Amino acid sequence: MIIDTTEVQAINSFSILESLKEVYGIIWMLIPIFTLVLGITIGVLVIVWLEREISAGIQQRIGPEYAGPLGILQALADGTKLLFKENLLPSRGDTRLFSIGPSIAVISILLSYLVIPFSYHLVLADLSIGVFLWIAISSIAPVGLLMSGYGSNNKYSFLGGLRAAAQSISYEIPLTLCVLSISLLSNSSSTVDIVEAQSKYGFWGWNLWRQPIGFLVFLISSLAECERLPFDLPEAEEELVAGYQTEYSGIKFGLFYVASYLNLLVSSLFVTVLYLGGWNLSIPYIFVPEVFEITKRGRVFGTIIGIFITLAKTYLFLFIPIATRWTLPRLRMDQLLNLGWKFLLPISLGNLLLTTCSQLISL
């Protein structure tokens, strides 16, 4: 039997070509993910620097100034220091829960970025249930905190984990009801559709004006979800040393630190998407994609402009949670639970009822 070498070479080259296509496909699939992770990392470093500078301004003192120009590398220096610190394990604790807890907290928050549109259709997962997927994923983080508190075998850590779980449950429900009201107004649960529904009238089309009560409830609930003052009871220094973080050191403590700022950034991004018009300009009847959709370069430029607008709104909004840290006193645990269950929950239910009635009347 004679084998044609030309056919063999053609088959081999075809198989090599197919395998190269698969490799390129995997690479192109990973590039957006790595780009998003890099962008999120830079975003967190910027938030840390902003918080230190704004806090210094509020307290009339000098902020970080030695690590890089204007102290912009101070957060990077702190992170590097944590990387090289010793990783201690509690002698009588549950080491598996102790080690898994920080990872669950960080991963659940990172997954929330999948449904955030940074510009026109610049989103990793444009799902029809995008906002509710974010709520479902973010509710996993307190499980990691509770595991960390329990695995530490420390009464302060365990109390901090219990507080984190109770606080998350109390404020998750009003937050969900506010998101449901926005979903009813936009006739969609997709984050992209919600932004596009606010694009027609520019600044006046923002859901902030159509849902002022919902915006205030969402703001308070998101601050509680991020455990920012006045809702930082899970890690109250005067009561619980450092809460569920008490026994942690090194990179694991750094993961909690990163998770806190990741959660703050994702909450601010969702405020921008749900209430502040997302990537759109604040000029009536001017929709960013339609302005730059003429050429390929125009599309790229429009995408960059959309990213810039989204981030500008997000970082401007971040001034509110940073300022409240040095303005409002910490609540007691009973006050926190009463605020969530007896005040915010009825208000968010009433807001949802009003939104539903207005939508039914407009049919």
UniProtKB/Swiss-Prot annotation:
<keyword id="KW-0472">Membrane</keyword>
<dbReference type="GO" id="GO:0048038">
    <property type="term" value="F:quinone binding"/>
</dbReference>
<dbReference type="GO" id="GO:0009535">
    <property type="term" value="C:chloroplast thylakoid membrane"/>
</dbReference>
<feature type="transmembrane region" description="Helical">
    <location>
        <begin position="127"/>
        <end position="147"/>
    </location>
</feature>
<feature type="transmembrane region" description="Helical">
    <location>
        <begin position="248"/>
        <end position="268"/>
    </location>
</feature>
<dbReference type="GO" id="GO:0016655">
    <property type="term" value="F:oxidoreductase activity, acting on NAD(P)H, quinone or similar compound as acceptor"/>
</dbReference>
<feature type="transmembrane region" description="Helical">
    <location>
        <begin position="300"/>
        <end position="320"/>
    </location>
</feature>
<protein>
    <recommendedName>
        <fullName>NAD(P)H-quinone oxidoreductase subunit 1, chloroplastic</fullName>
        <ecNumber>7.1.1.-</ecNumber>
    </recommendedName>
</protein>
<keyword id="KW-0150">Chloroplast</keyword>
<feature type="transmembrane region" description="Helical">
    <location>
        <begin position="30"/>
        <end position="50"/>
    </location>
</feature>
<keyword id="KW-0934">Plastid</keyword>
<dbReference type="InterPro" id="IPR001694">
    <property type="entry name" value="NADH_UbQ_OxRdtase_su1/FPO"/>
</dbReference>
<feature type="transmembrane region" description="Helical">
    <location>
        <begin position="104"/>
        <end position="124"/>
    </location>
</feature>
<dbReference type="GO" id="GO:0019684">
    <property type="term" value="P:photosynthesis, light reaction"/>
</dbReference>
<feature type="transmembrane region" description="Helical">
    <location>
        <begin position="343"/>
        <end position="363"/>
    </location>
</feature>
<keyword id="KW-1278">Translocase</keyword>
<keyword id="KW-0793">Thylakoid</keyword>
<comment type="similarity">
    <text>Belongs to the complex I subunit 1 family.</text>
</comment>
<keyword id="KW-0812">Transmembrane</keyword>
<dbReference type="Pfam" id="PF00146">
    <property type="entry name" value="NADHdh"/>
</dbReference>
<keyword id="KW-0520">NAD</keyword>
<comment type="subunit">
    <text>NDH is composed of at least 16 different subunits, 5 of which are encoded in the nucleus.</text>
</comment>
<comment type="function">
    <text>NDH shuttles electrons from NAD(P)H:plastoquinone, via FMN and iron-sulfur (Fe-S) centers, to quinones in the photosynthetic chain and possibly in a chloroplast respiratory chain. The immediate electron acceptor for the enzyme in this species is believed to be plastoquinone. Couples the redox reaction to proton translocation, and thus conserves the redox energy in a proton gradient.</text>
</comment>
<keyword id="KW-0618">Plastoquinone</keyword>
<keyword id="KW-0874">Quinone</keyword>
<keyword id="KW-0521">NADP</keyword>
<dbReference type="InterPro" id="IPR018086">
    <property type="entry name" value="NADH_UbQ_OxRdtase_su1_CS"/>
</dbReference>
<keyword id="KW-1133">Transmembrane helix</keyword>
